[in-house]
């Protein structure tokens, strides 16, 4: 809103003669506007003839002037004013003759009237509440932007200065009415004097009419030259300095032709101005004096001007006698404007029909000019009492996951028609308008298990997510205590997903997942709503009917808020065929509503939901109203036609009914959002119905009053049950943007529709402005079963002005809290918000951004980021910084999980002096604080005290203790209530001394009124009844015994007793006594070197000095009543807190000591570590509490609102941030977020960013002619076996090891006489699987990236059982992969798929190496290169692609062509070619000088790889393709050599020189030929034993046998699958109830246990407290030996089969033998020897410790084989280490050796 408030308002010079249209609009606006200033102008306009007569009576010279112009103008306006209808009077202007030279007596007052009317219309257009004075807001805004208190904010030129004076002199809009009247009268007088001077001059023989023209010169001329020419014409003069190169010249009309010709000859451009008479000339001096006499002499006279004579004279001189220095004045004004901190444009409002802002100033950067206008008037719409506000909205439609994206589709006329996503309908091809990600769901956010999500209809899942965003956009989460009285009305038609669920084995989730009642029920259940929850099915009109029911429910009181809309997802091919068979759908393309080529509708899917609330409630509660549903209506077609065809009479009747309910005329509706499905029968009927009601020929149709019709189905198809709400959302977006979008696919009208007469109804073919002052639309939705629903939606009423208009100027920083259920969602939201800020078309202030975010964040979610920003650019930088962590975890620690909030204790301080620390800035800014302070002030005044405003803001001492205590209480109360109103959950309150009275009120013991009675009455007694000795108090740093001894010793020395008043801390106490006694104590304490401080209290409280008021105070305490506390209160009593509150205890509280330390420690003992928050400011109470606390886990928060060096609002912001970081859900109460933003922003703000994963249950086919395997297959080599089962986000691919492509690739490469998979083959298979999961990315732009690929157990020719590829999604288009079989894990890493068109280059490609300067030391032709490889591998000729290679010490450059064996298969060609690329690095390694003949190099993995789309399709493009390969040795670590390889396309094509592949960090391990031979043999030998042959593993990598794993690991997997709990979070001690299991989950796990273990386990509600360990034990007790827990023993006969992914927990499941092995002592000498052996295989110089992990030391599969051999040589132990876990340490390896029983040999030095 602030962006549209002008910094300067400029009133132009005397108007040109207005056009008839302008006069018409002016008269209509003056007639119909209720604004006070226009009522006054209307009255003076009607009285012009009478005023003119009085004026003529005062000046004889006016007698010669004609009365006709004024009388004619008045009479014309009078006819217009008394006319009944606008249409009747629009043509009654013929008698008003508009001449080019109207007299000044008419033009001058008309100028002021136009200025005031345009200004008034501008105020109306701000969208602010009529009850607020918009003019006041304008004045404050322009004042706050001006750097000086002196200088105008309203500027006027010539007659315009009168309008500016009226605006500037008016503090309110009511005052403007008086000043506008004065300005019009004054303009009449000025015009009369100018006209009379013209008439007098005409009597001269040399008279010539004075006229004006503008002169503008360029660079080849100058002002001096112009002035020199003017000197030749004595009567000509400069009247206005318009710009630095432009002036207005007034001259006799007879001189003008020659003068203008002279100027033009010198290159000066001239333009005439229709102003007649002599303004800005000294000859008008007498007229000036006469005017001053007329307007200042008689306050009761008709021409009195209430501006003061000096001010009036200044204005009159600027018009009559002095040249106008307009350019200087405007330059000074513009320069006085303070630059906006957020670099928002400076805005100037220009009023009048003549533009007068100097062009050079108008062209300044970031200078935005708004020009006043007079548009046709409209009567204010009176919203019915039953009006329903739309306060939130969200959607998900084809191509649009947000409302902004949906508008982009509408505005561009896009069509989302296309084929269904792959696999949606099996192998069938279906066209329509589809969501690309209907299977995606954020199960974690909604607390739904992955397995349950799998069985849920996607309509339920998508409705949940869209509901969350709609509720979020409504500000529901911004409320500290959201109301649960919310209804949920969802329209749902088909439930296609039933086919998917019913074709699979029934589960406990099958019914709840497919029943349509659960679509609405789940939403209500998640939000804990108690209002009606209803699913509605009226076919295609379901969502509109749901909105109708929701509005009715609110009106009837069934709920106070409602969520309404609809959802439609298609997944059943038979259902689609059924609809097609009915002849409804269009088989030729998209919907074409009302078009000549319409042949039926195309189906669509999506979801749209809106949040509704009664309009009156929404406005009073400050909700952001996006639009208003003023009426809804439903009926049924009368049956006169086919049931699926609409009936004209039924539809037109419905329109009339809904108009009647809305109290609207048909002409008020300017847009009809039709059902418009594009059918030949339905479209003409609907069009005719709309035209009959909204476009009748008898209705007056101005050009701007055109009625448009359209249908959203042209863009997104017929979304059936979600179609009605789609139309509603379209209207909301049209209201936001003020535009009517084009109808997609429309070229010509359906010939069956009769053409409209006089353009009554139009169909937009381009984006058009919605040219109505009041915008209303009717949405029609028809159901195929005959239901008609109509909804009228109109613009929201004006928004109320913020109660604190200068809030934004007082704030320097805003706090931001970003929350989500997962880290991924937090970061995605940061990115989305940063992009919104960067691309938002409307200027957004930091305050608006804060408001938007504050109202939408759900503070109860698990993860959060909190920070402050002082400018919009800083906010963007912080958001971008946090968002980048999503890709680079080194940038930032991940978003912290929301902490378990410590109990919060509110601490109220005592009286610390006679001054207060209360900030006016905080009071002005905070709605919550101000509301509570005002409440206290009102009650205090009712009790007879004066208001404490504004004295309470002063930091001067308050002498009257009654005022002091009432203020102190009010401040503490207001601060505490501000925190509570902001949603702070308080567990305990505690008050020190006086603060305990406030704490009693906040806790609920005392009402506010009773508390003030007690506080004020007590203060009155202290002031009036206290003894002569006031007393004094002294703080002493000494322990309790010392304080009591000091008090006793002083009391024993004289009559004055000393008491301990406050036990503040272990070493902090306050003594109280007479002034003399305290002075003596202070002296003695100083002698004893004790730290003391005299307190600035007014009296000696908590001492015998209080006795003087005790009796009367007791009487007072008996007057008030005491309640049980709502918030627990800890009283500062000695041994225990008060159980009940009595008058006696309250009275004694003022007399007895304050045992604050004791009370604080009791709170700590009861609640544990707490957050201690001060209720007030700078009292030091929380610091005292800190001294008494024993645990460092307590957290202290204190506001510093009175420090002169601290911005008080910043202190509130900082404290809020501290509380957020401690896990609190409190809001920042320093300002009211709803005041800072316009509702239109809420339709564009990004919603919650879901962390989704696919959940789609395949539909088993019943067609016996089709394959029983529904899995998509690619060339037979790799097939998708399972998706998202049993683990979420996991896709499992089976590999056909007998496929020809695999055999063909391996056939041409022999490694040491055997087969070993090349690294390229692993990459190829993984790439293909990733491509299958990202079919939405065109292959032509699909970019594949790998990270951290590592070969664990190499593969060869051995056919392995269960060989599969597992991909687990970790991010969008990013998967962690594992190639594994039943016996081993073979390769791991990460694969990422990007779209080359949109992705940025990976980091490792940011700086490519320069190979141009490499010096060649050795070159080898093709044959020599392969000869070097022969000691490792031999390649058949057809598989060779290396043409030549050149090398030096660390670099190799080679040329590679496509090998002949590539054939026609892209997969085969890419794999074989990629293998040739990798050979370049291997050849370089083999060629090094220190390479031994018995050594070879094997690649075990790499760091990062990027494969371009060009390379992936190279084999298809050109059989003669060649590449240039550059390789460099980037690092050398012992036996490990790292290489980087870059491949560029060679040749002369357009792709030449482009990067095909980049591979960095390839690890080549130097190993012996014999070690590699072992690897080859192992990879080619059938029936390998997976883990050990003779040695059992140590406890650190104990793994269950196949049978035992089926209890623990399968149980854990089942629980993970059903609850969504992460595997790593499930331990034996995990309690079932803590995993979020409900009754359905219990039923499902019982069924799954029966299915897996064949045992019957019943889990009762009592068992919900059981642990996972107990459940496993119960299963074990019933299982057969094949399923039982089998202990793993450490002897040579034990053979184990390991699951690489599941380890036993360290729990009671460990066997006895395992425990004994764990307890074996480790021998230091043996450990050293093992470490030395390992070190020889590492060779990196890194220290090898017992805790060192083998994996981190670089021991890959090849190195492990050599280590295995060396262990046998050194220790006589044969161990197989290939299956060791990645966490295996040196200590674990040592334990393996020890368990072989060879310690004796080692100790005897056998090795």
From Swiss-Prot:
Residues 1416-1573 are annotated as: C-terminal hotdog fold. Residues 1690-1720 are annotated as: Disordered. Pfam families: Acyl_transf_1, ketoacyl-synt, Ketoacyl-synt_C, PP-binding, SAT. Residues 919-1176 form the Malonyl-CoA:ACP transacylase (MAT) domain. The keyword Acyltransferase applies. Keywords: Acyltransferase, Multifunctional enzyme, Phosphopantetheine, Phosphoprotein, Repeat, Transferase. One of its GO terms (biological process) is fatty acid biosynthetic process. Gene3D superfamilies: 3.30.70.3290, 3.40.47.10, ACP-like, Malonyl-Coenzyme A Acyl Carrier Protein, domain 2, Polyketide synthase dehydratase. Residues 385-795 form the Ketosynthase family 3 (KS3) domain. Pathway: Secondary metabolite biosynthesis; terpenoid biosynthesis. Residues 1272-1398 are annotated as: N-terminal hotdog fold. Its EC number is 2.3.1.-. Multidomain protein; including a starter unit:ACP transacylase (SAT) that selects the starter unit; a ketosynthase (KS) that catalyzes repeated decarboxylative condensation to elongate the polyketide backbone; a malonyl-CoA:ACP transacylase (MAT) that selects and transfers the extender unit malonyl-CoA; a product template (PT) domain that controls the immediate cyclization regioselectivity of the reactive polyketide backbone; and 2 acyl-carrier proteins (ACPs) that serve as the tether of the growing and completed polyketide via its phosphopantetheinyl arm. PANTHER family: FATTY ACID SYNTHASE, NON-REDUCING POLYKETIDE SYNTHASE AUSA-RELATED. Non-reducing polyketide synthase; part of the cluster A that mediates the biosynthesis of chevalone E and its oxidized derivatives that possess a unique five-membered lactone ring and can synergistically enhance the cytotoxicity of doxorubicin (DOX) in breast cancer cells. Within the pathway, cle1 takes part to the biosynthesis of the molecular scaffold via the synthesis the alpha-pyrone triacetic acid lactone (TAL) from one molecule of acetyl-CoA and two molecules of malonyl-CoA. This is Triacetic acid lactone synthase cle1. It comes from Aspergillus versicolor.
